[in-house]
Amino acid sequence: MLEIIPKYRIIVVEDTLELPVESLRNLQYNIIRMKVRSALLKSGTEVSADDGIRTSLRLGDSSLIIGEIRSTEAEALYEAMRVGALANVVAGTIHGASAYGVFDRVVNDLKVPATSFKATDIIAVCNPIKSPDGLHSWKRMLQLTEVRKHWREDPLIEKGFTDLLKYNVKKDELEPTDDLINGDSETLKDIASNVKGWAGNWDAIYDNVLLRAKIKKEIVEVAEKTG
């Protein structure tokens, strides 16, 4: 969420209040939190997650963050993503051990049409890494996967997933894949197509990616030193 430019309004839809909304407000982010009813409850004073998402669409250009996608709100979410109703980032959390696991959950469990799933651009897979004795664990991002748009029914069989970053457990770090290094990213190229100096220039795009990585690394190192 910190990657969103503060001038853009952020709408957070959650049934359990977990995201650091107040901290972001203290950093001058324009952020609205909408508390919705749990998917486990059929009635109550709070609106459903489905209605919460549809209400957020009426607020105009915003970034939409869903705390966790659990039920029928998935259909409303993908409807918004397909039509570009929010004109900015749409992100959410869903349980899945891999990119295909997310696809399986969204399409087969939550009944979102497979063609609608193509509105997904990027899937970040996070899971705990355990110590050999099983007593310790660390949360890590294991892969960053791009969802291509050319497949029809099954993105796994039809090569609709492309890993851009993969976790190296020995080095304890994310590493770029050959696809990313060689410029085989439709998402990044699509973003770059609207940026002067980046369109059609993969070297400029990748240099900027590396620069941003160095900036983030410096921020983390300073934070660790200063506590």
Model features per residue range: what roles?
Residues I122-A213:
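Conserved P-loop NTPase
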Residues L2-I129:
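Switch/coupling sub-region of P-loop NTPases
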Residues K225-G227:
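C-terminal non-catalytic accessory extensions
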